[in-house]
Amino acid sequence: MAHNHWCNLFSVALVCVVALVMVQYSVAQNSPQDYVDAHNAARSAVNVGPVTWDESVAAFARQYAQSRAGDCRLVHSGDPRYGENLAFGSGFELTGRNAVDMWVAERNDYNPNTNTCAPGKVCGHYTQVVWRNSVRIGCARVRCNNGAWFITCNYSPPGNYAGQRPY
């Protein structure tokens, strides 16, 4: 009987530790510093200076993300004060780091010599991440009513101006 009691206590403790690690991992992939670090790694790779977290930009991102929680549609805010990258994930837990990594993966479709995307490809998320003049960011992540994840990163000043190079 005592053996079963200790086994049950051990099992409960193990479940709690695993749950704590999972929560910690999830939080660790969504902190302001995680967003900043992911952006700055991409920027550093092309010799662009770092971004910093801006709480006023982040407040806008949070407000906009909350407004999308009802339908989780990838619709841009249209606010001219900010550049904006959006991400959506369903069927898995999309983290902020995942979103930035998806945007940065578009670098393979960007030709810096011609300042164009490969035919039929998208690369504007990547160019916003590395846009030299966009030096302040704020990002937010929400769980939508349908269970999917919506992430926005906003950039100040905005980038992706037609005919201009990101770096």
From Swiss-Prot:
Protein name, per record: Pathogenesis-related protein PR-1 type
Signal peptide: 1-29
Organism: Sambucus nigra (European elder)
GO terms, biological process: defense response
Annotated family: Belongs to the CRISP family.
Intrachain S-S bonds: 72-144, 117-123, 139-153
Biological role stated in the UniProt entry: Probably involved in the defense reaction of plants against pathogens.
The keyword NADP belongs to this UniProt entry's keyword annotation: no
InterPro entries: Allrgn_V5/Tpx1_CS, CAP_dom, CAP_sf, CRISP-related
GO CC, alphabetical: extracellular region
SUPFAM superfamilies for this protein: PR-1-like (SSF55797)
Record SMART domains: SCP (SM00198)
Presence of the UniProt keyword Ribonucleoprotein in the record: no
Keywords annotated in UniProt: Disulfide bond, Pathogenesis-related protein, Plant defense, Signal
Pfam family, one: CAP
Segments forming domain SCP: 36-155
